[in-house]
From Swiss-Prot:
Gene3D superfamilies, A to Z: HUPs
PANTHER family assigned to the protein according to its UniProt record, in alphabetical order: ELECTRON TRANSFER FLAVOPROTEIN BETA-SUBUNIT, ELECTRON TRANSFER FLAVOPROTEIN SUBUNIT BETA
Transport found in the keyword field: yes
Gene, per the UniProt record: etfB
Phylogenetic placement of the source organism: Bacteria, Pseudomonadati, Pseudomonadota, Gammaproteobacteria, Oceanospirillales
Subunit details: Heterodimer of an alpha and a beta subunit.
Xref: SMART domains: ETF (SM00893)
GO molecular function: electron transfer activity
InterPro entries noted in UniProt: ETF_a/b_N, ETF_b, Rossmann-like_a/b/a_fold
Alphabetic keyword roster: Electron transport, Transport
Family statement drawn from the similarity comment of this UniProt entry: Belongs to the ETF beta-subunit/FixA family.
Effect of gene knockout: Deletion mutant loses its ability to grow using DMG as the sole nitrogen source but is still capable of utilizing sarcosine and glycine as the sole nitrogen source.
Function: Participates in the electron transfer process during N,N-dimethylglycine (DMG) degradation to sarcosine.
Name the UniProt record assigns to this protein: Electron transfer flavoprotein subunit beta
Pfam families per record: ETF
Length: 267
């Protein structure tokens, strides 16, 4: 018989996955950031990775969820929730019951409200630390994880946090592998009932197609790494606008609103 320490994984990881939406066609798919989180979890040594989804299960959503199974998993835990339900209580209950060391999720959902607040609300309810913009997990030792956080302009910051913890990933995380058709079809969705809490605020919202995007501010384009570095290091050149000093908060707010209207961010 093997010792218990050899049978117990050094790191238990739960990846929260959601149903994505293709930005051009609108078809359901695996969410890009969640898939990056799955890829990141698979790269961890001595880790037992579990996939968890809370939501409605139908033909289209099942096809999207099987996209995660096609990344090399035999099963996915599904907490059935009706459309429009608040999945926070069900996810918190499931995570509290399984007590993983690390929970990985995307920054925000591609469908529905998409506020990006779910990881923060989960961390608040469970009392766990949260790190956003994760790029890599460097090491896990003695209940502490060394993480690499992505910052603007390609910078990275090394952090140490105590487990259990919740981390979110964005486009800086590893590119997800292609989903394999065979494993995706052979994998199973382990359905279970969870606490249902209606989202009364979301029910009052009106959802409609987004308007054309507003005019973007000037972006410096560079063809080489040297040019990109020079553009990042150079001081911004003033091409208009004004510098406000010794003004009241009301005057400052009015100036900001005027700029946003001029740039057609607000109408």
């Amino acid at each position: 018989m093997q010792p218990e320490s050899a049978m117990t994984p050094a790191l238990e990881v739960t990846v929260l996955v959601s149903i994505g939406r293709h930005p051009l066609t609108g078809r359901v798919r695996r969410a890009d950031q969640d898939a990056r989180g799955v890829e990141l979890a698979r790269s961890l040594a001595d880790a037992e990775v579990r996939l968890l989804h809370a939501g409605e299960c139908n033909e289209s959503s099942e096809a999207a969820l099987r996209g995660y199974l096609g990344m090399g998993f035999s099963e996915l835990a599904l907490i059935e929730q009706p459309e429009g339900a608040d999945v926070l209580p069900a996810l918190a209950e499931a995570l509290d019951a399984t007590s993983p060391h690390l929970v990985i999720t995307g920054e925000r959902a591609e469908r529905g409200e998409g506020s990006g607040l779910l990881p923060y609300l989960l961390a608040e309810r469970l009392g766990w630390p949260l790190v956003s913009g994760l790029a890599a997990v460097e090491s896990v030792e003695d209940g502490m994880a060394t993480l690499l956080q992505a910052l603007p302009r390609g910078q990275r910051r090394r952090l140490k946090i105590r487990l259990p913890a919740i981390v979110t990933v964005d486009d800086a995380a590893p590119t997800p592998r292609q989903s394999a058709y065979g494993p995706a079809r052979r994998g199973t969705l382990e359905s279970s009932a969870g606490e249902v809490c209606n989202d009364d605020e979301w029910a009052t919202w009106q959802v409609q197609p987004a308007r054309p995007r507003p005019k973007r501010l000037k972006i410096v384009k560079a063809a080489s790494a040297r040019d990109r570095f020079k553009a990042a290091a150079a001081k911004a050149e003033g091409t208009g606008g004004q510098v406000l000093t010794d003004v009241t908060p009301t005057q400052g707010a009015e100036a900001i609103l005027t700029l946003l209207r001029d740039e057609e961010v607000l109408r």
